[in-house]
Amino acid sequence: MLRFLNLPSLLGEGLGVRLKNINMQITLEELLKSRDERHAHQMELLKEHEGLTLVCLTVVMPGSVKRNVQSLVAAHAGVDALRERFAGETVALEERDLDTGYEAYLLTRLSPLEAKERACEIEETHMLGRLFDIDVIDASGCPLPRSIVGRGERRCLVCDGEARYCMRNHSHSLDELQARINSMIDAYVQRI
């Protein structure tokens, strides 16, 4: 259970607090449509800003509710981490709060490999890093794999095994995943 009440003061500037449609379930069709729209937006940004590297942040939130207090806290923390890690290298940062989840798009002059290294560092060292999905998108619109910078697979939130394996095999219940996310968010909020 989250132990804070003053969400606006906790989050400060940035994504803001849009409480409309919070905890609303989305359908698989809506989720798939949002992925297509995100890819189209990425391609548009790459076309408009040729020569820059695109970094895209989304929040890992299992289940049919993508916008909740936990994902809002994680998104805000992720955007703050991007701002800090890419300080002085950021050309533009766009944040989007959609019914299907939070997204941030950062354009940088860094090479795709250097941007991917920084993205992996955030995912691996931030308290909430496992809740961040930070992709570096190449000129063809494909995300660079972690292996390109010598990083291993993402780890599972619950057992620390390979996340892809646990997800594919439904190794953990939604309740287990949500309990772990709540615990991570609670610990993070207590520290800030």
Give names to the regions the model predicted.
Residues 22-89, 97-99, 117, 123-192:
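Long, contiguous binding/interaction regions
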Residues 91-92, 98-109:
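Aromatic-anchored, charged helix-turn/loop surface patch used as a conserved interaction hotspot
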